[in-house]
From Swiss-Prot:
Residues 310-935 are annotated as: Formyltetrahydrofolate synthetase domain. Trifunctional enzyme that catalyzes the interconversion of three forms of one-carbon-substituted tetrahydrofolate: (6R)-5,10-methylene-5,6,7,8-tetrahydrofolate, 5,10-methenyltetrahydrofolate and (6S)-10-formyltetrahydrofolate. These derivatives of tetrahydrofolate are differentially required in nucleotide and amino acid biosynthesis, (6S)-10-formyltetrahydrofolate being required for purine biosynthesis while (6R)-5,10-methylene-5,6,7,8-tetrahydrofolate is used for serine and methionine biosynthesis for instance. ATP binds at T380, P381, L382, G383, E384, G385, K386, S387. Keywords: Acetylation, Amino-acid biosynthesis, ATP-binding, Cytoplasm, Histidine biosynthesis, Hydrolase, Ligase, Methionine biosynthesis, Multifunctional enzyme, NADP, Nucleotide-binding, One-carbon metabolism, Oxidoreductase, Phosphoprotein, Purine biosynthesis. PANTHER family: C-1-TETRAHYDROFOLATE SYNTHASE, CYTOPLASMIC (PTHR48099:SF1), C-1-TETRAHYDROFOLATE SYNTHASE, CYTOPLASMIC-RELATED (PTHR48099). NADP(+) binds at G172, R173, S174, S197. It comes from Mus musculus (Mouse). The N-terminal methylenetetrahydrofolate dehydrogenase and methenyltetrahydrofolate cyclohydrolase (D/C) domain carries both the methylenetetrahydrofolate dehydrogenase and methenyltetrahydrofolate cyclohydrolase activities. This is C-1-tetrahydrofolate synthase, cytoplasmic. The keyword Ubl conjugation does not apply. The lineage of its organism: Eukaryota, Metazoa, Chordata, Craniata, Vertebrata. The modification Phosphoserine is found at S318, S413, S490.
Amino acid sequence: MAPAGILNGKLVSAQIRDRLKNQVTRMQEQVPGFTPGLAILQVGDRDDSNLYINVKLKAAEEIGIKATHIKLPRTSTESEVLKYVISLNEDASVHGFIVQLPLDSENSINTEAVINAIAPEKDVDGLTSVSAGKLARGDLNDCFIPCTPKGCLELIKEAGVQIAGRHAVVVGRSKIVGAPMHDLLLWNNATVTTCHSKTANLDKEVNKGDILVVATGQPEMVKGEWIKPGAVVIDCGINYVPDDTKPNGRKVVGDVAYDEAKERASFITPVPGGVGPMTVAMLMQSTVESAQRFLQKFKPGKWTIQYNKLNLKTPVPSDIAISRSCKPKLIGNLAREIGLLTEEVELYGETKAKVLLSALDRLKHQPDGKYVVVTGITPTPLGEGKSTTTIGLVQALGAHLRQNVFACVRQPSQGPTFGIKGGAAGGGYSQVIPMEEFNLHLTGDIHAITAANNLVAAAIDARIFHELTQTDKALFNRLVPSVNGIRKFSDIQIRRLRRLGIEKTDPTTLTDDEINRFARLDIDPETITWQRVLDTNDRFLRKITIGQSPTEKGHTRTAQFDISVASEIMAVLALTSSLEDMRERLGRMVVASSKKGEPISCEDLGVSGALTVLMKDAIKPNLMQTLEGTPVFVHAGPFANIAHGNSSIIADRIALKLVGPEGFVVTEAGFGADIGMEKFFNIKCRYSGLQPHVVVLVATVRALKMHGGGPTVTAGLPLPKAYTEEDLDLVEKGFSNLRKQIENARMFGVPVVVAVNVFKTDTDAELDLVSRLSREHGAFDAVKCTHWAEGGQGALALAQAVQRASQAPSSFQLLYDLKLSIEDKIRIIAQRIYGADDIELLPEAQNKAEIYTKQGFGNLPICMAKTHLSLSHNPEQKGVPTGFVLPIRDIRASVGAGFLYPLVGTMSTMPGLPTRPCFYDIDLDPETEQVNGLF
């Protein structure tokens, strides 16, 4: 018989490594920035372990796998090792890891406990009980196989032997080689016999094997004469035996007597150079397979989401009754369904979570989805249902059209919740749930804004007080205190010195003039624009006197409280793009001017770093869900008059990455299109760089009747008869407002879909008239929507229209160039969006325009603070007013947020409580902890 063919593990493993290298390259081409990750956890410092690990690290580097070696000292305890295992389980950059055995610790460590703590999806060594169980059951495509048996199988296949139907004999039953080898051969359809130290007539059993795998750890235990002629022999042994002819006095042999066996076998593995190289190659292959599974599971845009089925009732129950009738999914499950990693999500109970900005960094190379903004016509005081339409639309796109879709909405203030309006989370069968969580504390973002805002306010008045009561030297010495005889500037103080043009870092070298310039902000109290805030409607805080305590030595001034969401910090949160950007914006916020007319910022006050600390969690978007189980980001809620009235850029950007290129992100702009949409485009999109694909313009028959000359609509009172009976003439006259808002949206080059929000008193003739006129005057489409009563099903036609519109040509453009003068930018908005003949800058506004231009703020975008109840400055003028000049009473600056806001009329920034606030109905069931009466 001819000598056996040699199964060269070095050659086969080299071929496998080349194949893996190509696979890694292709993965990185498909997902830029992605690299398969392998970690090796070692306890102790055994020489043999160090050798094996170095071989693995080198192989990983050659293939393109990022390998990390974590080496723990011999003093490590079991709990310390387990902490590292858990950490690696949660590290998304590690797709597989192994615990190098044996564990070389001076403490007792349960190896089984450590191995079984490895997440099965990362168990690339295939040693956990879960992996072993799946292999034993034949779930070969859903588990990792121990590397040595896996390599042995590759070598058997390399021999060209058909495994199915052959008799295979495995000598050895270890958990690492023998037992899994038996299972692997069995599920490749061999008839398998496992032999071990207690097997009788071992030689005769071995002689039955067409395929023989030996893993006993006994040098040359299996003799050549035992082997069936023509068998394939796989020798897994590595043994050292004495050999005087070798320089080190020993040689390596396997578990099979090689020289004898090769005369009877058809193929045989040498030792070394057979199974050994294959073990390392299989570890690399399993790591690449794990990375591929990770990409498949977390591929952007590939969601495995389950939707909730609504149980619709007629008549439609109350919002809170509907909210409680639907059990929300666990928020952690929803996060996984939409492709978020465990370490990217911070759970706040079972129904809300924060999403870390690291998700955006992970997905930064992925294409964005389609971007949709929901706006409305000039509304009645009752509102026309933009929020409800937003939620109904995403439920239709997701639960009914099976599109990946995210809603991004503003977080409501608690003020209205306990005041007159009540909560806000959509309505009917189109809601964000749980409503109680949505409308109360949520995750504390508004509380963080309140704390940060009031820290600035406290810093302003304290600084004025201390400057008025101390000499330059005393003030400087307290600002730069001596610690152990040494004075040292803080980082923020060094930045102030740089802005002052003082290039010094040693406090002792400043001249008297430099000390004066550094220490004194010299704030002019009459110019302070920063107010304290509270998230409660409190009319008696609209104007207050502060500093009346004797300890303030008579330094009083008139001030006020605003509602928390009116704080510039809320606008900063909504417009920021990163932690670094937020830090810079918070520092740029201007709170007053000096007596020389120079702007005083939070950076000058030295408080910007502390503000960033207070806001570090608030910057993370809040994840919730709709009634039908689609995801919602609830993040930021700036005013829509003195601010831009849109949810956060960060939430939109993360959502656009998560939905994938075929998915949709639907966000809402506050008030009518002339205010919220205009600011969405000219401020939010300008800063984010994002380009919307579709505008959804919400209209109602009742609002059109109002604009057509219908009676006054008053919140809290029944609708006049004209609004509950058919009147086509009134609707057609009022269409002028909708026509103008369609025109406003198209001015930005984006397709417009009109969503006619249906009320039970609307007639088909009225609804058809609105739809027909909308299409005739430039809308891409106009559809009737019944999502309040029917959930996503009622917005199905709207969702289909949005899908079609998103494919239509668009040429997004901004309304004005930032380099224009402040006055010209205001004029463009007034004339083109509102239809004004011109603007009039009143003296205070003219003065502010000159000051801001001089201070370098003239190139900021414009955020008009105007009534939302009319296109003009007069809330009583409905339809499309003409022939008016828009009066600009004042101009103020939100420098940190990044806009100037001209005041058209008087803006209330602190609501008051009515005679009978909502809180009369609110209570808690002490047994169930259920909130009652909130809606």
